[in-house]
Amino acid sequence: MDIKTLREKSADELKAHLIDLRKEQFSVRMQQVTGQLPKTHDIRRVRREIARVKTLLGSTK
């Protein structure tokens, strides 16, 4: 998700999205550990999106 669509969301929606991203990050990590992750760039993508959401949450306070 790009930054423009994230900025349009409310703080509650961002928090819910952050929870979903954390779950996805856990899933991607487990796939990496077990050797079942075909797209290794997903680790980086999820980590950066979490950073974007946390940045927006911090700036809205």
Swiss-Prot record:
GO terms for biological process: translation. Pfam families: Ribosomal_L29 (PF00831). Keywords: Ribonucleoprotein, Ribosomal protein. CDD domains: Ribosomal_L29_HIP. GO terms for cellular component: cytosolic large ribosomal subunit. Gene3D superfamilies: 1.10.287.310. It comes from the Bacteria. Signal peptide: none annotated. GO terms for molecular function: structural constituent of ribosome. SUPFAM superfamilies: Ribosomal protein L29 (L29p). InterPro entries: Ribosomal_protein_uL29, Ribosomal_uL29, Ribosomal_uL29_CS, Ribosomal_uL29_sf. Belongs to the universal ribosomal protein uL29 family. This is Large ribosomal subunit protein uL29. It comes from Stenotrophomonas maltophilia (strain K279a). The lineage of its organism: Bacteria, Pseudomonadati, Pseudomonadota, Gammaproteobacteria, Lysobacterales. The gene is rpmC.
